[in-house]
Amino acid sequence: MSHLKTSTEDEEPTEEYENVGNAASKWPKVEDPMPESKVGDTCVWDSKVENQQKKPVENRMKEDKSSIREAISKAKSTANIKTEQEGEASEKSLHLSPQHITHQTMPIGQRGSEQGKRVENINGTSYPSLQQKTNAVKKLHKCDECGKSFKYNSRLVQHKIMHTGEKRYECDDCGGTFRSSSSLRVHKRIHTGEKPYKCEECGKAYMSYSSLINHKSTHSGEKNCKCDECGKSFNYSSVLDQHKRIHTGEKPYECGECGKAFRNSSGLRVHKRIHTGEKPYECDICGKTFSNSSGLRVHKRIHTGEKPYECDECGKAFITCRTLLNHKSIHFGDKPYKCDECEKSFNYSSLLIQHKVIHTGEKPYECDECGKAFRNSSGLIVHKRIHTGEKPYKCDVCGKAFSYSSGLAVHKSIHPGKKAHECKECGKSFSYNSLLLQHRTIHTGERPYVCDVCGKTFRNNAGLKVHRRLHTGEKPYKCDVCGKAYISRSSLKNHKGIHLGEKPYKCSYCEKSFNYSSALEQHKRIHTREKPFGCDECGKAFRNNSGLKVHKRIHTGERPYKCEECGKAYISLSSLINHKSVHPGEKPFKCDECEKAFITYRTLTNHKKVHLGEKPYKCDVCEKSFNYTSLLSQHRRVHTREKPYECDRCEKVFRNNSSLKVHKRIHTGERPYECDVCGKAYISHSSLINHKSTHPGRTPHTCDECGKAFFSSRTLISHKRVHLGEKPFKCVECGKSFSYSSLLSQHKRIHTGEKPYVCDRCGKAFRNSSGLTVHKRIHTGEKPYECDECGKAYISHSSLINHKSVHQGKQPYNCECGKSFNYRSVLDQHKRIHTGKKPYRCNECGKAFNIRSNLTKHKRTHTGEESLNVIYVGSYSGTSQKRTYEGGNALDGGRMRMPL
């Protein structure tokens, strides 16, 4: 032991003395330098320093020599501790804080009479505790790279290897290099599978001694090393030191290839594999390799289905903690990553990095086959499948394969089965959550993808990508039949259906077929009444987004479509086109048969079919023929009852756009058709024609049956049905037939209960506008129809006609039983006596009546309202009979007296 000498501040102990208990020592390890129960704690040795007897250093050293010899001989006889275990402890000491390094390099030995405390090593053998020096020793050896100080030069030499990156020990199995032989020995156990260090608590085995020590702390549950920055606790001071670098930003381990720095050596080691291409960790299921064990561990969860990290907000589970943390930011609304160009925020840093490429225009990932470049590697990987023909995403139902996972997701929705992801707004279900998330943007109105050229927004990136081609002029999808090019694959696919004559998308409600799936989806909403596009201003809903877009202009006041003739502006292009027809313009295409002129040649061609008698378009339901496809399409809606044109003001629906156009003029007040005789204006051309017939000499078409004259031949043809008894318009509910479609429409409201015309004075509703017009005269007192016999006036023309029959003694309405009546309505009521029909039913008790007035009286028995005196006068064979209801007095006049 002559080589042991007194250590002063100016000299360094020899390596043998300095590294007692470490791998470099020639002596066997006397005791565990960091007892497992106190690893990383504020060491008990520190507290013992104050209580130590303050002997001269020389005296203590002499006493310690004998203790060391005794301890060494005991250690040799009781334990055979492997040198690599000690070496490992030595390596670990490089990462310990200075005070723990001091403890590890102290001379061994302490008087048992002073403390008497003993510590067990890993094998259970007890040795005396180490004695710490009383006076602190200055750290004179400083690293000129990072400024860290050491007491001994040998420590500094070992530390410098971190900066130089020198690794002299190479693994002959995988080529991995290490700074020390002990690290290489531990590494080789990865290849051999040897795990010599076993936990006596649970039996779990480890390759290295330090790993076992780390593991043992899980049983004790102690975390005695606390970070004074954030309060986080750790089992070991070395781990705490590494953690502190997060706060300080210190990254002492730098890559010699690219200069990237890391907080710890393991991070650098894994990073270097990027340059070397080394991936030593292989999945035993699919053969995929990884540069680090954690990557393999996470990957294996794909095969096992394990998702240990669950969100406590929504229950969604993830395979990594980081993915869970990223997901949680959705619930918190956190978007901490902000673009300094456009200030757009993102949940994840990776998304921000991808986004920034939009501003730089950088596309670093280039295809070596065709030269196409991409912003990210994933885009290139997917693109390469076009060249390789690889289709890794296979449908487990039908076996069809796809290049993209999104393609498979869309395809799977074709197969029937439960769709687990349901929209809470409208109840629509989806096979995948990603599709549900895309769908939800319909309800939220969220459009996060903005075109940097025109500012137009989109719900998804794919929509934006296709839209950008409008600005660039790129049309990558070309038809191989006619050469026409398109900006999207779906547009090309739809176009090809024209050549094939295909309309593959068939409505399951009315069997109507469409070229496009999108057109079918929109059409189906007519049947389902679904209106997913809601206005956030007034709550009004629409079947499609374009309808909502036009509607929103009502709130914003925007009118982008302006007439260049008069300057009038409109909210939609169709409104402008309709308006333009008011202005006289050039019509260069003239019909040589009737000299009628048209704006377009196509319109002229269609018109000529009228003269030729051609009606090539035939209805497959009723075989009626038409000149134009548009007329056939409109006609078909009679059979399907489809009314796709809806008014955005009052929600009234129409079979064709022209009817909607005319209807809208009620709301706008526009009356473009003016009478050249009296100046009165109307909303439709047909109304003007009808009006003109009131002027003398303006009715050239006369009925040869009754002499009644009409302005148009069409009106005359309709009128003649009265004489011929034709009633082509039949009600499907009750079978009743009518001469005019307008009468059928009014009649249908009896079955539907619809009364769209409401009096603004008393709230009474009517089935038709004429009923409302007559009713309003009750409030105004207006009676424009006066009898020229007796001067009595009436509010309606029909009432006057009925009254005149009293003077003439006529009762033109005869029943088969011989009774006659002045009024058709009275005859209809009378006939119900013979048929037994009682169409008026009480919704309280179900009792039925043959006339409405009886139902009205009956209802008062439920409401408790007092009965009114109602008089009904009917004539039988020229004799007038008076009936008094509820004991009321009979009134003259041949009409009912009703309270106002």
Swiss-Prot record:
It is found in: Nucleus. Residues 47-73, 83-94 have a biased composition (Basic and acidic residues). Residues 9-18 have a biased composition (Acidic residues). It holds the Pfam family zf-C2H2. A zinc finger (C2H2-type) spans 225-247, 253-275, 281-303, 309-331, 337-359, 365-387, 393-415, 421-443, 449-471, 477-499, 505-527, 533-555, 561-583, 589-611, 617-639, 645-667, 673-695, 701-723, 729-751, 757-779, 785-807, 813-834, 840-862. Gene3D superfamilies: Classic Zinc Finger. Residues 1-97 are annotated as: Disordered. The keyword Transcription regulation applies. The keyword Methyltransferase does not apply. Keywords: Isopeptide bond, Metal-binding, Nucleus, Repeat, Transcription, Transcription regulation, Ubl conjugation, Zinc, Zinc-finger. Signal peptide: none annotated. PROSITE patterns: ZINC_FINGER_C2H2_1, ZINC_FINGER_C2H2_2. Belongs to the krueppel C2H2-type zinc-finger protein family. This is Zinc finger protein 62 homolog. The gene is ZFP62.
